[in-house]
């Protein structure tokens, strides 16, 4: 340790940065492992104390983001997102441009409320169904869905972790935090520009391609089960806000083997009904003796289906926990809307710190029974949390060691006395490239200290630099690996790696131009 502590702190910080970027780009190690490795490396090289190296895990930003994952889960699991999507898209008709306009605006608003990934995951099945009804290949609608969601993340403070991070950096630089709705000043123009480009140009820049891997559509799934099991029940009676169905397969060595069942019987616990049974391609009639491999169609309350699907001896074909997400305004939806509304009021008024508002909402959702404790833990993207917590110390090291000042001085000497606009443009080009290769969250945590140093050297406000940084970090459009949302739509639409940049490049240019020329008008240097 004594030898390591004599390593030049600036050199150590820059070497750790380069190694981290290489690890991120190579994709050979989990993101969380890389982030933790960064924090530990900063400690072992003596750049940071142990408290500083681990401070990210107790940072209010990390707690705020973790709580927002629970809020997002509640909106998704109770069918609020599905309900909103169905109501809006049902009025859009089947014209391609109208669909793109409606889908783009809808996902932008939803992503501002529940995150980019949550919005795309919630609306993806619905958009595929709409594409089928409009006789359009999903490839014409799904990439616009992901890209419009990224634009929508700039509408509110809670739209993406990046927004929260740049706001915290602003406070750390001695300036005010960005307001909850303040991001809309740049977010609204970005959403409008993005949706217009998607509406009028995506047809020529996207492939006409189908994919065999399609997401679940609840009503189509229910109709398929009704047909396969020769049921006389109406589809609307199979699934609803309170009750649903799930198909389970009897596993080998299941305790159910040898028992007798018949259609219409209730299970021994009294909370589920056996609607029908199949053995191979044949629908079984009357009383049967259960064998391994038999398929049973069970109906009951969603909570009961979820509980029994996890029991030993049966294998659910589709998880009822996932199926219930596609029920509009399911159990707990009203409570969720009230709690989320209260959180938005707290965030907008600033009555309590953002992390406190989100934690209060998350606790209220758990205590009111909307989200179960295991479900709350499972909803949190621990990769994202660990990534941010592990990379925050790198930002601290950049500032503490003077590495940020060194890089800032190098950039400024490279461009000469060209003023803040050129400095901003150069910094944003670096950000744009990095955000296509590694997480945009990690990119911002790396670049933000450099942005603050450049602003301080030029004697200008850091706010336009930080807001512009958030804008360009959201422009992760050129590769499928740039964001999880880009990857989500890849298989259902049949996209290939080279499909993304064709539509992504015009959007990236739009975001870059807005960041360089429009942002400083709203947040002056």
Language-model features, listed with the residues they occupy:
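Hydrophobic transmembrane alpha-helices of multi-pass small-molecule transporters
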Residues: 1-66, 70-72, 204, 209, ...
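Membrane-embedded alpha-helical segments and adjacent helix-loop junctions characteristic
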Residues: 33, 40, 47-134, 194-207, ...
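Juxtamembrane and boundary regions of transmembrane helices in multi-pass small-molecule transporters
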Residues: 133-143, 153-232, 296-314, 470-525
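Hydrophobic alpha-helical transmembrane segments
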Residues: 10-15, 32-37, 63, 97-105, ...
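Transmembrane alpha-helix interface/packing and boundary motifs in multi-pass membrane proteins
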Residues: 20-29, 106-115, 147-157, 345-351, ...
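Generic detector of multi-pass transmembrane helix bundles and their immediately adjacent loops
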Residues: 408-413, 420-494, 498-513, 517-522
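Alpha-helical transmembrane segments of multi-pass membrane proteins
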Residues: 96-109, 135-152, 181-183, 420-433, ...
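Re-entrant/interfacial helical elements at transmembrane boundaries that shape
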Residues: 38-39, 83-85, 117-130, 142-146, ...
């Amino acid at each position: 340790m004594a030898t390591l502590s004599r390593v030049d702190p600036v050199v150590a910080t820059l070497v750790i940065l380069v190694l981290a970027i290489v690890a991120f780009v190579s994709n050979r190690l989990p993101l969380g492992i890389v982030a933790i490795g960064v924090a530990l490396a900063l400690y072992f090289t003596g750049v940071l104390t142990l408290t500083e190296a681990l401070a990210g895990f107790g940072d209010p930003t990390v707690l705020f983001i973790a709580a927002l994952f629970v809020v997002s889960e509640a909106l998704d699991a109770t069918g609020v997102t599905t309900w909103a999507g169905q109501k809006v898209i049902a009025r859009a008709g089947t014209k391609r441009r109208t669909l793109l306009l409606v889908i783009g605006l809808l996902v932008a608003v939803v992503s501002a409320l529940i995150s980019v990934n949550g919005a795309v995951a919630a609306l993806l099945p619905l958009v595929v169904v709409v594409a089928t009804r409009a006789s359009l290949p999903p490839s014409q609608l799904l990439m616009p869905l992901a890209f419009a969601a990224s634009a929508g993340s700039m509408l509110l403070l809670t739209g993406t972790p990046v927004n929260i991070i740049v706001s915290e950096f602003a406070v750390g630089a001695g300036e005010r935090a960005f307001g909850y709705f303040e991001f809309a000043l740049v977010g609204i123009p970005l959403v409008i520009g993005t949706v217009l480009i998607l509406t009028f140009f995506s047809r020529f820049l996207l492939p006409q391609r189908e994919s065999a891997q399609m997401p679940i559509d609840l009503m189509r799934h229910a109709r398929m089960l009704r047909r396969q099991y020769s049921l006389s029940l109406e589809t609307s009676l199979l699934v609803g806000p309170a009750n649903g169905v799930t198909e389970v397969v009897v596993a080998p060595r299941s305790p159910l083997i040898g028992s007798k069942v018949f259609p219409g019987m209730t299970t021994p616990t009294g909370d589920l009904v056996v609607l029908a049974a199949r053995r191979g391609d044949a629908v079984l009639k009357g009383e049967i003796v259960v064998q391994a491999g038999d398929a049973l169609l069970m109906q009951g309350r969603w909570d009961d289906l979820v509980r029994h699907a996890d029991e030993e001896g049966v294998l659910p074909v589709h998880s009822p926990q996932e199926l219930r997400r596609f029920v509009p305004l399911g159990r707990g939806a009203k409570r969720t809307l009230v709690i989320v509304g209260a959180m938005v009021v707290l965030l907008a008024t600033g009555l309590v710190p953002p992390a406190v508002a989100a934690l209060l909402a998350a606790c209220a959702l758990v205590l009111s029974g909307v989200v179960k404790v295991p479900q709350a833990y499972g909803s949190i993207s621990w990769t994202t949390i660990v990534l941010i917590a592990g990379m925050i110390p790198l930002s601290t090291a950049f500032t503490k060691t003077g590495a940020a000042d060194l890089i800032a001085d190098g950039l400024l000497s490279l461009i000469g006395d060209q003023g803040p606009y050129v400095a901003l443009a150069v910094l944003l080009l670096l950000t744009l490239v990095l955000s296509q290769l590694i997480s945009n969250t990690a990119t911002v945590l790396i670049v933000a200290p450099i942005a603050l140093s450049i602003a301080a050297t030029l004697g200008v406000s850091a706010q336009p630099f930080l807001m512009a940084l958030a804008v360009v970090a959201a422009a992760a459009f050129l590769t499928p690996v740039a964001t999880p949302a880009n990857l989500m739509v890849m298989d259902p639409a049949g996209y290939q790696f080279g499909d993304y940049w064709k539509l992504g490049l015009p959007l990236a240019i739009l975001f870059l131009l807005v960041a360089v020329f429009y942002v400083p008008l709203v947040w002056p240097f």
